[in-house]
Amino acid sequence: MIYNRCGKSGLKLSAISLGFWKNFGHNGVFSNMEDMVHTAFDLGITHFDLANNYGNPYNGSAEENFGRILDRGMREFRDELCISTKAGYEMWDGPYGDRNGSRKYLTASLDQSLKRMKLDYVDIFYHHVFDPNTPLEETALALDNAVRQGKALYVGVSNYNARQTEEISAIFKELKTPFVVNQPSYSMMNRWIEEDGLDRWAEENGVGISVFSPLYQGLLTDKYLGGIPEDSRVGRGDTWLGGQLDDDFRKKLNALNDVAHERGQKLSQMALSWVLHNSAVTTVLIGASRPSQIVENTESIRRIDFTDEEIARIENILQNKH
C-alpha cells in the first residue's frame, strides 16, 4: 500500500480507502461487511470513511455495523486505523436534524456517531455539504469545538467548491483548527474540481483531497461494456447516472477499456490510477459489495504512472476525438 501525506499535515492516508456509503447498512449481510473490512485492512487500507446518514434501511446503520465489526476483534487495532465520519445532510426529524451546518446539528450528530461506533473520537470529522443558510463562522467553530473537546483529531469539508473551501480555510487558520482535507467527487467522467480549480487550490494551500465516486457510481467498470446487466446498480435503478449509459457513453467505455487492457489493467483499475495520478489527490474512496472487488481495486496502486501518449489517448476519448 502507498501512504500519502494529507496536504501539509502529519496525517498519512492509504492511497486506497474504503467507503461505507453503500453495502454496509442493515439490509446487507453482516458477515460480508466484516469480510470486506478485514480484507481491506489486510491489504494495508487503514482509512475507513463513514457518515451519519450512510446505511439502509435507516440512517446511521453503517456506523452501527462498523461499531459491531470493531467489537469483533478490530477494536484492538484502533491506533492503526484512521476513521472519518461526516454530518451535513438530513438526518432526523424536526428543524435541528435537517440539511444544515449549524453548531447544534453538527455537535449532536458527532455525539450520535461516536455512540453508534462506540468510539471516544474520530480521526477526521467533516461537514458533509456546504450550507448557504448558516454562517461559515458557525460551521467552522462547530468543527473546531469538536477538536478542542477531543472528539475529533482533524476536520474536513466535503462537497465544497474552491471558493467555499478558501473561505472556510481562512477561518480555520484564525482558529488554528487542523483543517486537512476536502472530499469531492472526481473521476474521468466528472472533472469539476479541475474546472473549478479546487485541486490546484488544495495542492497550493496544503489541503488534502479525498475523492469519492472515482468510478463514477460504478459506471467506469467492464460491467457495462456491452449493455446494462439486470443485477447491476443501473439495472436495479440504484444510481441516478443510469440515464447516461447511451451508445456514445458505451463507446467511450470500450475505448478506455482498450487502453486499460494495453496497460495490463482492468477499466476500473485504470480509472482509479488516473485519479491518483493527479498530484493533488491524497486518497480515493472505493465502494465494494464483496471482498474480491477490494482486492482488485487495490491493485490499481501498482500502475499510477501514465505515459504522455496514454494521457493523450484518454483525453481524446473523453473529448470524443477518438
Q: What spans do the regions from the language model cover?
A:
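Alpha-helix N-cap and loop-to-helix initiation/capping positions
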Residues: 28-35, 58-61, 65, 97-105, ...
